[in-house]
Design a protein with these regions (language model features):
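Auxiliary Fe-S-binding modules of radical SAM enzymes
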Residues: 2, 146, 153-196
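Short loop/turn segments at strand-loop or loop-helix junctions that form parts
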Residues: 9-12, 186-188
Length: 196
């Protein structure tokens, strides 16, 4: 028996207005009440979670939230324009768990300023937040992005395939051995990515 969920991925769902979130959630919630689907999954940023938002998510049948944690190293967060402290991530995780919502974390390895050690320490810190599931994404340089500019200027060095595989292996193993189900490794290719 597979679970049937509606998913809002590919953006920061809780970054849109509460009113618009409610409209989307209410629409889907009607299908939950009719037994046609089991729940709602979504992804968002840790700094777009607060009590009011989580209460609304729970009210309308959200069963799983994946946070784009990326890193728990302050230097890496700053270098990637994530201007919030690690405590914000911890608080978002805690709040979701308190409301009984499955917690997913998305980690990126090889970001600007990241090292093997900082990526591994991020995974160790993430374990303290008790995620249920995780995704691990090696950083990709995509055309027409700030990261591509940094790469072309020699300000960022992408991981080699071998480095990315080895780093991912270490983090995957750490998470799985500690009871976190890693549900994806790597980015799902899309037409847009293939063109770039």
């Amino acid at each position: 028996n597979y679970k049937k969920d509606v998913a809002f991925f590919g953006g920061t769902f809780t970054g849109i207005s509460l009113k618009l979130q409610k409209e989307y959630l209410e629409t889907v919630y009607e299908y939950i009440k009719k037994g046609l689907i089991d729940g709602i999954r979504l992804s968002t940023r840790p700094d777009c979670i607060n009590r009011e938002i989580v209460e609304q998510l729970k009210k309308y049948g959200v069963t799983s939230v994946e946070l784009g944690v990326q890193s728990l190293d302050e230097r890496v967060l700053k270098a990637t324009a994530r201007y919030y402290p690690v405590e914000v991530v911890a608080e978002a995780c805690k709040r979701l768990k308190q409301y009984g919502i499955e917690l997913g974390i998305q980690l990126m390895i090889g970001l600007p300023e990241a090292t093997l050690e900082s990526d591994y320490l991020t995974a160790l810190k993430a374990l303290e937040m008790q995620p249920d599931v995780a995704r691990i994404y090696p950083t990709l340089v995509i055309k027409n992005t700030k990261l591509e500019d940094m790469f072309l200027k020699g300000e960022y060095y992408a991981l080699s395939i071998e480095e990315a595989v080895e780093r991912t292996r270490k983090i995957y193993t750490l998470l799985e051995l500690n009871g976190v189900n890693v549900i994806r490794v790597g980015l799902q290719p899309s037409e847009d990515l293939r063109e770039d």
